[in-house]
A protein has these predicted regions:
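A shared catalytic/ligand-binding motif for oxyanion handling
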Residues: 1-203
């Protein structure tokens, strides 16, 4: 067991939209620059595990989509004693990894959820699995830190500057937030950022 006197965690998370070639070098540079000890990636597009290489002090966990696209990765510095709790990789990708700090244990959840244009019945399994893992963490007395590409827009009720209205996926996610009294980081005053990409869906 590594020294678990780690008192602070620093998270680096992004939707990679395909993490390969130059993006891997950029990822490692960002992690080193920010001194992050937890990394989550959504939409890795990897077809097999082990393609994304990071510093050997990180323990890597991946869920790979059976068909093209998707995928999620969690990388944890070894000093946080990471251990895999759950991995889903059938119709969607979800990883649950537990870490230990000096004061508490946290379950880091990373996932890539259903597209809004999927059939309605294909949306529910992802959100059911997500809520199940939150409930398991609560029963075990663990905190949760959740980073998702859930293809869910929560709207201005949760994120004050969100220019979008809540979507059906967002409604499912909002139900989980309310039932478990979760805090939406993007809606916090501490969260700042710039929109770097906009997509127009023409009818």
């Amino acid at each position: 067991m590594k020294n678990n006197r780690v008192t602070h965690i620093k998270l680096f998370s992004t939707n990679g939209a395909g993490v390969k070639n130059g993006k891997v070098a950029s990822l490692n540079a960002e992690v080193q620059s920010t001194q992050s000890n937890i990394v989550t990636l959504q939409e890795t597009h990897c077809t097999q595990k082990g393609k994304i290489k990071m510093d050997k002090t990180f323990v890597m966990f991946e869920a790979i989509r059976k068909r093209k696209g998707g995928g999620t990765l969690v990388a944890i510095h070894e000093d946080l004693n990471p251990k895999l709790i759950a991995e889903y990789d059938e119709e969607f990708e979800l990883l649950v990894v537990e870490v230990d700090t000096a004061d508490t244990s946290i379950r880091v959840i990373s996932g890539y959820g259903p597209h809004k244009n999927w059939e309605e019945e294909k949306h529910l399994p992802f959100f059911i699995a997500l809520e199940t893992e939150i409930e398991k963490a609560e029963l075990a007395g663990k905190s949760v830190l959740i980073e998702l590409e859930a293809n869910s827009k929560l709207g201005p009720n949760y994120i004050s500057k969100d220019p979008h209205n809540i979507t059906p996926n967002g409604t499912l996610l909002a139900g989980i937030i309310e039932r478990h009294t979760l805090v939406v980081g993007n809606g916090s005053d501490r969260c700042v950022g710039t929109i770097t990409r906009k997509k127009s869906n023409k009818k």
